[in-house]
Design a protein with these regions (language model features):
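Compact, glycine-rich, soluble single-domain proteins
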Residues: 1-76
């Protein structure tokens, strides 16, 4: 059993594995940047105003808005 959360809930320096992406809208765009089930993601930093947040995804740093990060279910 795992303790699922969202990508948005990760603290700076924390890592997690992607479980699934909810919603149909931009799921393809998120998959194109490497957010697919099984991918390890690490939260690197948040902008001073709170968003976007930078994540390390498959060796590349990507910035995601909170609304996108909330759609990504992860497990520690």
């Amino acid at each position: 059993m795992y303790n699922a959360s969202t990508l948005r809930a990760l603290g700076i320096g924390e890592s997690a594995r992607v479980l699934e992406i909810s919603g149909a809208g931009d799921s393809r765009r998120l998959a194109d940047i490497g957010l697919v089930p099984g991918t390890e993601v690490r939260c690197l930093l948040r902008a001073p105003c709170g968003e976007p947040t930078a994540y390390l995804i498959r060796g590349a740093v990507m910035a995601l808005r909170d609304e996108d990060a909330e759609r990504v279910a992860v497990e520690p």
